[in-house]
Amino acid sequence: YTFPFYKWIMSKKIKFFIKNNNIESLHVHDLQIASSVFFANFSFNLNITLDLHENRPEIMKFYKHVNSFLGKILISPYKWRIAEEKYCKMANSIIVVTDLAKRELIGRININEDRVVVFSNSVSKSFYSDFKLDNNIFDKYSDSFVLLYLGNTSKRRGLETVLKSIPEIIKSIFNFKLVIVGSSSYDNELIRIVSDLNISKYVDFEGWKDEALFPSYIKAAQIGISPLHSNLHHDTTYANKLFQYMSLGCPVIRSDVMAQKILL
């Protein structure tokens, strides 16, 4: 929403698609492409559903590339916020993932609450009913008490808090193992904390893995964690990992950010 080039290119493609496929309505997934869709739709006046997967303008404030020197020059979360409000007012209906997100949106934008539908995150049935157990993962942790974290490991995800609790945890759980499946640019700092606390034997950094392996990690775990820090984004959205854990019957420890607190 800083430069119009993407909108111009994509709107032309979308307009061609609408015209040649007899489209009757449009469903826009998240804010990134919304401007292109609305721009293309001027010629057709179709009903548009704007599906907001998250509070993107808010979470962008925490992105490393947005906070870099070039990012601060080229990317404006404020302009994204203005765009979000503009297209929410233009949309025929809006989808958000929590009641808290609906409440926040209606409180910020003068729109009828009947236009805002809550449709929560979920996992596909095949994730928990049609997976193949990877015995290598299961055997690797068969003798450990596994605390599992799935997903992005950036600072706002709260793993630093978990790492700093390990010296106390291992006093009572001798076979404890924190297994982190995911990564981010913050990993070097997490690795430094592990080294400083001398807890390397209790932490496995697995990096990103194919989602097909997630059920095996979950089945190997005693507890799944979601230690998110509180902010306007985390307080109004759900982490997918919560539903992945629960779908396979894995107990969950979560932080008290509002959305997680209400869910669990």
Regions found by a protein language model. Name each.
Residues R157, E206, A212-Y217, G224-M246, ...:
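Nucleotide-sugar-dependent
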Residues N188-P215, I223:
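Nucleotide-activated donor-binding/catalytic signature segment of Leloir-type glycosyltransferases, i.e.
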Residues W8-K19, S35, F39-S43, R56-E58, ...:
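Membrane-proximal helix-turn-helix segments that form the acceptor-binding/catalytic region
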Residues I95, V123, D139-I166, V179:
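Conserved donor-binding/catalytic core segment of Leloir-type glycosyltransferases
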Residues Y1, T49-I82, N112, S126, ...:
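Acceptor-binding helix/loop patch of EC 2.4 sugar-transfer enzymes
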Residues L150, K177-I191, G207-W208:
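Glycosyltransferase donor-sugar binding loop
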Residues D130-V146, K171:
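Nucleotide-sugar donor-binding and catalytic loop/hinge architecture
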Residues L100, S122:
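Carbohydrate-associated surface elements
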